[in-house]
Amino acid sequence: MTRLVILDNEAVQALRDPAHPKHRLVISHAQVIVSRKRRAAAIELVVPTAVRVEAGWDRASSAWVLPNRLRIADIPLDTANASTAAAIRNQTGVSVADAHLGAVIQSALADQITVITSDPGDMRLVAGDRKVTVAAI
């Protein structure tokens, strides 16, 4: 079974800032993922690049050292994801970042998808017909 864990904007911001009120909660999710990877579980932690931009995550900046160490993979807004995201945005009116996140959910090959988010309603909306686990922060 393959698992995909996707971060939304607030989860990314909380990872960076130890003073963020949700920092501990997001760190605890990240620790679970790291421990499962150590046990050779097929799990990947990702961030859509539009979410990364919205959060201000510059991988070259020393301010983002902790998220950079977690080996969170970028999911680019390529042609296919852009078309899906545009359709999601047109249907729902969500932000570009949330639409990109929805495109990642809808195109994922993983058996199980989890989204760490501060907006569970929007994540269920952009997921379309895909079953997702929403970890609300």
Q: Positions of the model-derived regions?
A:
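Short, hydrophobic beta-strand segments that form beta-sheet elements in well-ordered domains
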Residues: 47, 55, 114-117
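Short, well-structured N-terminal submotif of metal-dependent ribonuclease cores
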Residues: 1-45, 56-70
